[in-house]
């Protein structure tokens, strides 16, 4: 409660300082007939852009909304160049009205960028997860921040299940043997296990966490979850999962830990050396939430020592991950670029959801309540 009050106080303080030039509050208003400058930041697909007509989440195909926007007189700029003072995005910051980004190639929207963006009214995330935005600064400036809630929850939950099995069965070394022309069954089997009977805990049981638990139930695991809210009894029965209020009580019991919570100031670096030290030796960790929830070097040290038996995920800090990021080179990892939530099916959903919110914005209509991350100076509960 104290932290929530402090957050609100920060917002009010920043808002009141607008008179001194720090932030000018903006109204969520798109007058009918007004031409808007909309900027989208997506990953570039290059030769893959034309290989699938539904590949909408890339620069080249731009969520499939270019013709629609331009037919209404709006300007639509799309780029993948988002870092540094001379990047393409920076050129458009002063006069854009709407900025669209994705978690897979995020445009980091800092307080400094918000201050420069005098016309900015709306920040949209095509997907789920808006931690690339300084939400306190956005709230103080009176901006609206929204995302396409639910658009890729199935995609991410399925990917998490895949990663659990990949780690449990020691799949990656076997694949590497085949590619290298080798054959050494012992080199795989000595640390390959069944999923049945193992204890799996999810830290966070929102939409993705619940779907993962539902998909794990047929495997005959002991399922635990920690969240700020306990599920309804009927949902607990459906998932077969047991609520553990104390995270420190749950973690040492788990053979597999899955991270399913948002990145906030409270969760940033949460899995540090001290917390990792409390985990069961040989624990497997899957993190498709956000890379910054983990303390980078603490993960590397624990994997190299064997305290963490395997680590898999598709989220890094920063993104794209630099070539020298240590998670690329640590043993017993099954890392990929950030792809779990950008399947073709997910792209169709978040492209449609983005278009729907733009239509509502142009008409002056509210978004679906669950899509708001910042509205009227208030942050959504999961980010407080």
Curated annotation (Swiss-Prot):
Catalyzed reactions per annotation: formate + NAD(+) = CO2 + NADH
PROSITE patterns associated with the record: D_2_HYDROXYACID_DH_1, D_2_HYDROXYACID_DH_2, D_2_HYDROXYACID_DH_3
Any GO BP: formate catabolic process
Induction: By one-carbon metabolites, such as methanol, formaldehyde, and formate (at protein level). Strongest induced by formaldehyde.
PANTHER family per the UniProt record, alphabetical: FORMATE DEHYDROGENASE 1
Family note: Belongs to the D-isomer specific 2-hydroxyacid dehydrogenase family. FDH subfamily.
Annotated protein name in UniProt: Formate dehydrogenase, chloroplastic/mitochondrial
Organism: Arabidopsis thaliana (Mouse-ear cress)
Phylogenetic placement of the source organism: Eukaryota, Viridiplantae, Streptophyta, Embryophyta, Tracheophyta
């Amino acid at each position: 409660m104290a932290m929530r009050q402090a957050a609100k106080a920060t917002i009010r303080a920043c808002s009141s300082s607008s008179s001194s030039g720090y932030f000018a509050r903006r109204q969520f208003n798109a007058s009918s007939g007004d031409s808007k400058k909309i900027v989208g930041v997506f990953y570039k697909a290059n030769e893959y852009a034309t290989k699938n007509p539904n590949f909408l989440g890339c620069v080249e195909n731009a969520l499939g909304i270019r013709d629609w926007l331009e037919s209404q007189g709006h300007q639509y700029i799309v780029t993948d160049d988002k870092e540094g003072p001379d990047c393409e995005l920076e050129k458009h910051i002063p006069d854009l009205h709407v900025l669209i980004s994705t978690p897979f190639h995020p445009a980091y929207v800092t307080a400094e960028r918000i201050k420069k963006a005098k016309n900015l009214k709306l920040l949209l995330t095509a997907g789920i997860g808006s931690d690339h935005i300084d939400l306190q600064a956005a709230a103080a400036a009176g901006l609206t921040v929204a995302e396409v809630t639910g658009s890729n929850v199935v995609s991410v939950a399925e990917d998490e299940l895949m990663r659990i099995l990949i780690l449990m069965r020691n799949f990656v070394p076997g694949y590497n043997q085949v590619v290298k022309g080798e054959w050494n069954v012992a080199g795989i089997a000595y640390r390959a296990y069944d999923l049945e009977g193992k204890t799996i805990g999810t830290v966070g049981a929102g939409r993705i966490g619940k779907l993962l638990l539902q998909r794990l139930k047929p495997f005959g695991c002991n399922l635990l979850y920690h969240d700020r809210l306990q599920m309804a009894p009927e949902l607990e029965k459906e998932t077969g999962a047991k609520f553990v209020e104390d995270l420190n009580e749950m973690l040492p019991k788990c053979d597999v830990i899955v991270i399913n919570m948002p990145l906030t100031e409270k969760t940033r670096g949460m899995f540090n050396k001290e917390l990792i030290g409390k985990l069961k030796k040989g624990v497997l960790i899957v993190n498709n939430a956000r890379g910054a929830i983990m303390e980078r070097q603490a993960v590397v040290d624990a994997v190299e020592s064997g305290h963490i038996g395997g680590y898999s995920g598709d989220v890094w800090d920063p993104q794209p991950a630099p070539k020298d990021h240590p998670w690329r080179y640590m043993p017993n990892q099954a890392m990929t670029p950030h792809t779990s939530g950008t399947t073709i099916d997910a792209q169709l959903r978040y492209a449609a959801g983005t278009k729907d919110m733009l239509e509502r914005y142009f008409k002056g209509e509210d978004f679906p309540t669950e899509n708001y991350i910042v509205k009227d100076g208030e942050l959504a509960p999961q980010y407080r």
